[in-house]
Amino acid sequence: MTASLSRTVLLALLALGGAAHAQYTGPKVTLTYLHGFTGADRPVMERLIQQFNATHPNIQVRAQAQPWGTTWQQLPALVASGRAPDVVVINEDQITNFIARGAVSPLTDAELKAAGINKARFYGPLFKTADYEGRSYGVPISSVAYVTFYNKDLMKKMGITKVPTTRAELLAAARACTTDKNGRKPGQAGFDPKNLDTWGISLYNNWVGSRLAYAAILQNGGSLVDKTLNASFNSPQAVEAVQFLVDLVQKHGVARPNSTEEAELAAFSQGKVCFFPSGQWYLDRFEGQKMNFGVAFVPRIGSKQDAAWGGSSHLTLPRQRPGYDANKRRAALEFINWMTQPAQNLTWTEAGSLPTMPAVANDKKFEGRPISGVFEKLGSIYATSGFPWSGQVLGPFDNAWANAYSGKMSVKAALDAGVSEANKQIQQARKTFQ
């Protein structure tokens, strides 16, 4: 697929895809569809549903939009009582939990093939986000990612001509970007890292800030959990990766100590910092401010692979009561296939999603757009999924990052304490799955 792939070609692909599988031809059914797209993305979703209903006379989808948290609270009881919706969107941080509790039904290879859903059309790690114990439970409809925003004007002023892609390049560029309020640079006599006028990179102390540490750990060959799904983010690979990030503050003085996301966001908007790693959801904000900025994939801080954090939403089929209408399940799979075709995914990117598949990332509508700077590596985005106790792992991990970044604890001590706390919580959580 070339970079000149157009929407017309995508529509042609959709038409071919529709002919490649046996479309639903059963009796007319009505599907209930529960999702949490309640913001600016809601009108886009409603438009897609209207298009589906208009082109599928024997399938009518009735959608209900409500806050994600409400769905997480209600879904177990709905499944247990046999009143589950036909299709539910579940996010990456919740899906493994619902799968492990038996609230979501697996999608067999035969079902996916019959519905025309080809796993290969999606980015591999994104599709596998909804896999568990070798089975698939969902199809991705939406994706977001942790990226690096960079200020082109400040980089030019500081003589930086290349967006860093490696650890060494990041450190060199960050040092070049950093100046204290007296005009001194890192390494010069009298340099004051506690009073910076401009600085190289934004680090901060909340869960979003910790996702850079997560990326660095994966890049270095580490992981949040081990094969037994116990916390393991204090491995030597993890300690080394996080130590580099903390050293950007404590050793090199190219990032502000103990800062917040809000403070760093404001500083980037004001042209004070060269590199602002965060969620791609700030794209519209920076474009609205008419900033001269770019978007790049997270530099490879580790030595093993490219990796960045990603969030995603997946179309799933909840477990239904005995005697559930098989026609409804076939129709629901038809709906899932249609919603995740290239043409629909291209439309969905209007709501702020990243492309979920290379065919859409190659569309010419993205040419010249800042966000296209990450498209070559969308296959290296990894969600924090695959273990049922995400909260029990991520809460202590986020706290460990905050303690290490702020200097309250050494990196190793912070990660060790985080793993200890996470595993205590996991031990308790395991009892609820027995």
Show which residues each predicted segment covers.
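Short, solvent-exposed loop/beta-turn-alpha elements that line the ligand-binding surface or hinge
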Residues: S105-F122, F191-N195, W199-N205, G222-A241, ...
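Short, well-ordered beta-strand elements
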Residues: P27-T38, I59-Q64, V87, Y137
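Long, aromatic- and glycine/proline-rich binding clefts that accommodate carbohydrate-like moieties
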Residues: R121, P125, A296, T349-N403, ...
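Extracytoplasmic/periplasmic substrate-recognition and gating elements
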Residues: A54-T55, Q60, K156-M158, Q243, ...
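Extracytoplasmic "Venus flytrap"/periplasmic binding protein-like
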Residues: R47-F122, D131, D153-T165, A267, ...
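Hinge/lid segment of periplasmic solute-binding proteins
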Residues: E92-V147, Q188-D197, L212-A215, N292-F297, ...
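Glycine-centered hinge/linker elements that transmit conformational signals in sensory
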Residues: A173-R175, K227-N258
